Amino acid sequence: MTSLADLPVDVSPRHEGERIRSGDMYVELAGPKSFGAELFKVVDPDEIEPDKVEVIGPDIDEMEEGGRYPFAIYVKAAGEELEEDVEGVLERRIHEFCNYVEGFMHLNQRDQIWCRVSKNVTEKGFRLEHLGIALRELYKEEFGNVIDSVEVTIMTDEEKVEEFLEYARRVYKKRDERAKGLSEEDVNEFYVCLMCQSFAPTHVCVITPDRPSLCGSITWHDAKAAYKIDPEGPIFPIEKGECLDPEAGEYEGVNEAVKEHSQGTVERVYLHSCLEYPHTSCGCFQAVVFYIPEVDGFGIVDREYPGETPIGLPFSTMAGEASGGEQQPGFVGVSYGYMESDKFLQYDGGWERVVWMPKALKERMKHAIPDELYDKIATEEDATTVEELREFLEKVEHPVVERWAEEEEEEEEKAPEEEAPAEEPTMEVKELPIAPGGGLNVKIVLKNAKIYAEKVIIKRADREDKS
């Protein structure tokens, strides 16, 4: 087979956004219950076998229905105009091109990919070789001006995928290191990526030198290179405009661009805040920052952590809160690269407000966490509930504890007013997300609220007496 027309399935942008539920799935590739990676490398012409597509390991017809398998995609390309700087952004197009393929779902990026193949296309004869052919032809079609030859290797053999995963992570690290050095103050242009609007139509990903894409795949340098080779593509520059608030990371040009490309849904963004006008998310983010009102601090959980956080919610539930292209104060999707930024959540207090992380994530980000704070951030080994978290923070004298004292002093100063007969106990909230645990599918957001109550009781309707 040498062309898209020869494939047993349709390949078209109209399949973007297709979700394959577990009941419709034939097999799952990589994902949270297995492992995998994807990589795009620019190589010399003599390092590539033009047009070669190879599958190493079992193909779809050799897999058991309902099974989960390791999975890797390796695309190598050569061309006189190709430069190493474009690898990251061309790699991100693997996500887009895979989703062009009927019956194939691709989520996330890098070493967090999660793919599914539907029963329907399996019955049509779809194989992983066909996916490789589709990727090869789409790269040649979309980037024929800079790509002379392409080779695609797809792996499902467990040992080969493990080896490839280690290699890919070394490449990712090298790319990320290359991206450091610039800050938002040093440039006049930021970049916008709309690649994920097929899944989240109002999500606009703003990429600055201090804030890589949420998926972690595209830095400011990557975006600049992407626009150079594909000026009509989903990544393009915007004028950052006047800086309205340097701490919050609010820029006139960003607000204008986000409003235009979100169809007016989002009008204002603080690039460096979780609590006020947070950046929107699509669902491909590497981690979620979430506010814990009981301790006035933030937790961070990534998709590698399978357990529940102290607020009773796992990553999967919070990912639903933060995604979809909507602003959800108290929840924001982030990349590992942004956690390394000097501007990480600086409007909200930065690392001094972070109180909980999974142990593995905390160790991964050790180089980014200030030394004096590292041992003061709890993990699942220190706290699994809000009560345990509060005790831990008091014990280690975390900086947020000082905030509690300040809040208590403010409350004491207001006490005489509250003792007046005409007044009941008052809670004033500018904006506070409350995400209840216990599997209760409810979210309450209080905006600019003043509440007078001795007690608040929330019940599920199906549990109330119907007599």
Swiss-Prot record:
E.C. number: 2.3.1.169
Annotated stretches, region: Disordered: 403-428
Keyword Transport: no
Ranges that cross the membrane: none
Catalytic reaction annotation: Co(I)-[corrinoid Fe-S protein] + acetyl-CoA + H(+) = methyl-Co(III)-[corrinoid Fe-S protein] + CO + CoA
GO biological processes: acetyl-CoA metabolic process
Family statement drawn from the similarity comment of this UniProt entry: Belongs to the CdhC family.
Subunit architecture: Monomer. The ACDS complex is made up of alpha, epsilon, beta, gamma and delta chains with a probable stoichiometry of (alpha(2)epsilon(2))(4)-beta(8)-(gamma(1)delta(1))(8).
HAMAP family: CdhC (MF_01138)
Record-given protein name: Acetyl-CoA decarbonylase/synthase complex subunit beta
Organism: Methanopyrus kandleri (strain AV19 / DSM 6324 / JCM 9639 / NBRC 100938)
Gene (name only): cdhC
